[in-house]
Each structure stands twice: as structure tokens, then as C-alpha cells.
Amino acid sequence: MTDVPPEIIEHYTEEVDEGERIAAGFSQLELLRVQEVVRRHLPAGSLRVLDVGGGTGIHAQWLAADGHSVHVVDPVPRHVQQAPNLGGVTSELGDARQLSANDDSVDVVLLFGPLYHLSEGEDRVRALREAMRVVRPDGLVFVAAVSKFASLFDGLARGLLFEPGFPEIVERDLREGEHRNPDRLPHRFTTAHFHHPDALRAEISAAGLDVVDLVGVEGLAGWLPHLADRWDDPEARQLILYSARAVEAEPSLLGLSAHLLAVARRRPASGTAPPASAARTPTSRR
């Protein structure tokens, strides 16, 4: 099953290089914040990680460097060809809704992409249930989503709101959570579903997973003008990170972030106690 809309495949094949995007410029904030949230929750030791929708392996790379065994599953052939070039990473062509992995076969699943490229709610819940199937009891599932308010804030921050056709995109995002790019302009992203924070939590719960944490990744800092330039200044970078961390769990401000990151856990097998690693208190957000 790889019936992904062709415009999504074309976007990641012909219009953008996802690895370069997230490793450069203002996306450095997104990358570093995802790293620290994931590392905060991971138990000690070498883990088996399934990176579903892992793209070119941008997250698989640092996880492998941390000593974990990482396998990328992605529906874009270009990504599957690129990911194995990273040390310690394997890959396969596949779909989040029908994974080839065996039941209970991994310690951690990343869903960084599938939920915002599956427009139907049933498909998103199906992907979450597949993640729950392949992760071991008490294992973790990390779920990324795009905030339904992202286009509005991006439009204001970068002046896109004043481009012909962009206000209509924003209106649909806010009304339905369905993002479309009829003019196929690369800077307007591609076909996607954008989440309200409450809806993301509800979908994860509907799949049978327990939500452990839900954070805003970038906060208002993600919309800072000239963020890429300020990021090069070490002192400014720490202030930017502080501003994101300070409000990451504030419910009234979650939607201000471009990206949401949920941490979910598969319930332990009936009659068994969680392992000691699962009972660890996550390190401080500060």
C-alpha cells in the first residue's frame, strides 16, 4: 500500500530536498528541539528504532550516532535510496498504514511525517495502530504534526499572507485542517493535514496509545524574523531555545508552534509491571 497522492511524491522528489531543508536555516531550531524532546524520553541503552516516514534519514542519522539501530520506512523512492548512505541506517519503501515489521519487534517508533500527509482521519488512526502493533509493550511512539495555525503565522512572518491565493489556503487550513497548494508553489508546501493540538491527542488516544507528553516544538521563536541569522550567534541561539522551552507544554500556546510533538506509550502487557526505564522521570525541560 503506497497510494500516496502524486503531488506529495513530486514535492519531495523534484521540489525540495527534505534533508537539506531541516538541516539548514530556520529549520535548525526544529531539528534541535526534536532531538532534545526525544532524548529526554528515551530509556537508557541501545534501542531498536523504526523511523516511519523518515525521509532522507535526518533523524535516523543522529539516533544512529547515539548508538541506536535505526530502520527507515518511507513512501518516496528518492528518500529510500538516500537514507542508507548514513552510517548505521537501513531503509525500505513502505507505507505507515501497512508496515512490514513484525509485532512487538521494535522499542521505539517515530512518526515524523505520516500524520500530516494522510488526509483521512481513519488513515491516521490506522498508521498509529500500526505503530502500536510493531512497538513492544511499554514502548514509545513519537508523533509529529503540523499545527493548523502554521500557515497563518508563516504568512504573517514571511509576508506570504499578502500573496494572491495564500489567504484562501489559510482559510481552509483554519476551517478544515486540510492544506492544499493548487498553484504548486514549493514554498507553500504540499497536500497535508494540519492538526489542532486537541485533535492530535484525540487521534493518538483513539488508536489505543497513552499520551505521555505533548509539546510545541518551536513556540513563537519559530516565527522570529531573521531566525537563521540569529541562530549563528551562540548567545542568541540559547535565548531562542530558552523561549521555545519555556512555553513548550503550556496548553494555551501549543498551537503557536509550527510543529507539535506527542510522546505516546503502548500499554504494558496485562499483568506485567513497567520496566525500570519506563518509570524514569524525564529530565527537566529547562
List PLM regions with ranges:
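C-terminal lobe and adjacent flexible extensions of AdoMet/dcAdoMet transferase-like proteins
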Residues: E203, A207-R286
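Class I SAM-dependent methyltransferase SAM/SAH-binding core
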Residues: L50, G57-Q98
